[in-house]
Amino acid sequence: VKHVIIGTAGHVDHGKTLLIKALTGIDTDRLAEEKKRGITIELGFAHLDWPDGTQAGIVDVPGHERFIKNMLAGAGGVDLAMLIVAADEGFMPQTVEHLNILTLLGIRDGLIVITKKDMVDAEWLEMVQEEVRERAKGSFLEGKPILAVSAYTGDGIAELKQALYTLVHAAAEKSVRVPFRLPVDRVFSVDGFGTVVTGTLIEGCINEGDAAELVPSGSETRIRNLQVHGSTVHTAYAGQRVAVNLAGLKKTDVQRGDAVARPGSVRISRMLDVKLTNLRDSGRVITNDMQVHLYHGAAVMLAKVVLLDRDALEPGESAYAQLRMAEPIAAKNGDRFVIRFYSPLETIGGGVILDDAPVRHKRNVPAVIEALRIKEGGSAGDRVEQTLVELKTALPVAAQLAAKLGMEAEQLAAELGGLLGAGRIVEPLPGRYIASSALDEVAASCKTLLAGYHAKNPLHAGMKAAELRQKLFRAMEQTIADALLSELCREGVIRRAGERYALAEFEVRYTKRQNAIRDKLLKYYRGAGIEPITVEEVVASFPQNERADFKQVMDSVLSAGELVMLSPEICYHKEAYARACGAAKAHFAENETITLAQMRDSLGTSRKYALAILEYFDKTGITKKEGDFRRLNRGFPPAQA
């Protein structure tokens, strides 16, 4: 079943409310003041039914210029526009403003209704029809049906109903496979139920019992009951007018302009990147840093317009801008908005949101403008890639990308597959992605760091993994940092040497003397096994003129993992250390703890060496000391497993 909202628009007292009553039998004037004054102040709602079961919601918006904010609150969820023009008055100021607003809100289909045809003669009616046709040129209503009716006599109502039926069936389906979002345009209390909100469900489907979040406040709630067109339902779908009974919230907790959404699906921000259009007939120049009233859904707030590539936006022009607000807004990419001049209040422009939670931009930066061009007009794949470029090393999962892009999961999966195949993005961890260009930036920074390290430490096998992670990624989660480094290894940028990283092309180059020292050092420790002499004694065994080279060579073989420094006094060859690990591992296979005596006996060595081994295990996190014994902590690395 297709769910469509039809919105009225037009000048005050041009017969919108009476026309809806003639179409539906429903009087949408619900306030005593409206009855008395004969104008619509608040939003009115009705539904139009056809014999085959087709149904559409109708939003009756106020026409008076003082109530434009209420008109905007109702027009946000409209699919089809019904522009109302009274035959006895023709196009009026609010007719023009309403048509401009509908255009800015992205409405692309509808028709024009000339009301009160019974009050004019045929010649006058023909003249009004021609005027309407001319005034609609250049708008989305150019070439659309123009129907003349009388709500008093019923003349033309059947034809109008049939024309609306045709438009409803031609309207695009709204997505129900994305998280639900319901902008709130009314809040009230019902005895025995509590807080009720109404609005047009603009995306997704909402079920009785669903957990929900009120944004931008972040208050948690639950969907207690649902009504659509006055009937209780268990599920409501995008494109329906919905009344929702919210659990756990007072009427004062909710404001018009809030939205009810799936928890975590809407990001809250005080800035928006937008494509902004200054209306041709606005009569005003939008200048950089201008204060305006921003209308989004049913929300209204002050905003500052920061023009990103110029100083002024003339009538009829469009440009990229950043809107900066003093209060939070709950918006999503692709949402439409309207801006009105600060004082006097008059509609001057609007547009589409390209980024609902951007960083603060500097002006006149070509890269920023190019990114916004991609977000506005790029292919779906281009937009996915650009989003990953901006997320840099965050490695988002698909669900995070879908939420940021407002893209359905199936489409996103297809786009990710295509980008992976083209080499434009990389998947360092299962289901987590980075743009290839962002990975290239990581590679360049990593190469610079390692090149500097190699220049200062030419005999070291590489930089310690922990040091490289800290310098390259700061406080990044270790799992992500290691995944990125592994990806650079796969791409041949760097290589791993034990617990160190080096440039792929780097090699330790010893002098002849250093090479001789290395050979002598390794030969001694290999032969010494698990009971070597102290490091100080080893140093003393080398001539004085070799001591400086000895220190460099010692650092080098330690960094390469050929020797393991258990303590300042005791150093092992890697083979002796592997033997010690093997003995401890065999013990832990049958016991939960190990004592100093058990370590000594399992290796057949003295207490001194057993203690050095166990303390090294503690220091590296393999074991944890508890009183007189030790338990496995992280366990043995694969190399010693």
Question: Where are the regions a protein language model picked out?
Answer:
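Conserved catalytic-core segments of large NTP-driven translation/proteostasis enzymes
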Residues: K117, E123, E134-S282
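Conserved nucleotide-binding/hydrolysis micro-motifs of P-loop NTPases
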Residues: H64-E65, D88-M92, I107, K116-D121, ...
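Conserved Switch II/interswitch segment of TRAFAC-class P-loop GTPases
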Residues: T54-Q55, V61-R66, G76-M127
